[in-house]
Amino acid sequence: MNVIETGIEGLVIIEPKVFGDERGYFFESFNEREFTEKVGPVRFVQDNESKSRYGVVRGLHFQKGEFAQAKLVRVVRGAVLDVAVDLREGSPTYGRWHAEDLTGENHRMMFIPRGFAHGFSVLSEEVVFQYKSDNLYCPSSEGAVAWNDPTLAIDWRIPKSEVILSEKDKHHPFLYEQ
């Protein structure tokens, strides 16, 4: 696997080694030994999968305190713009974000350390999105930043009139209100 730095400490893009032939392809989506060597130790405890359609924006979500989560995210089918925002207090890159095209074709993954908000927009007709997390989901520790925070000014690459949000995601505070 190839690890690509993003300019934000700990937030990396992972390109797996894909083996393909006339039958299709194969790649390791996670190998604990290699991940530990190239990125650092992590113990994933929960896998999640979602299916969404074009225009959906999910996020920007995080968990607080002892329930903070690191995530390894990827797309099985379709395409997203995946976004991680550094919320680590004292970080020299606090409030900075990185966006990456993750697709079922490029097989790229993003490793998002604890202390980041995460979200994505669906750019294809449909997407199947998977992620591993190193801590269990805890509803009472949920936090979020508004997807359209003007300070962050994230271009989700979807016209605002076509954005589809959950009721919950419509009402998150801006970063400065945290």
Labelled PLM ranges:
Residues M1-R108, S121-E126, S133-Q178:
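Non-catalytic, conserved peripheral segments adjacent to functional cores
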Residues H118:
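Active-site micro-motifs of SAM-dependent methyltransferase domains
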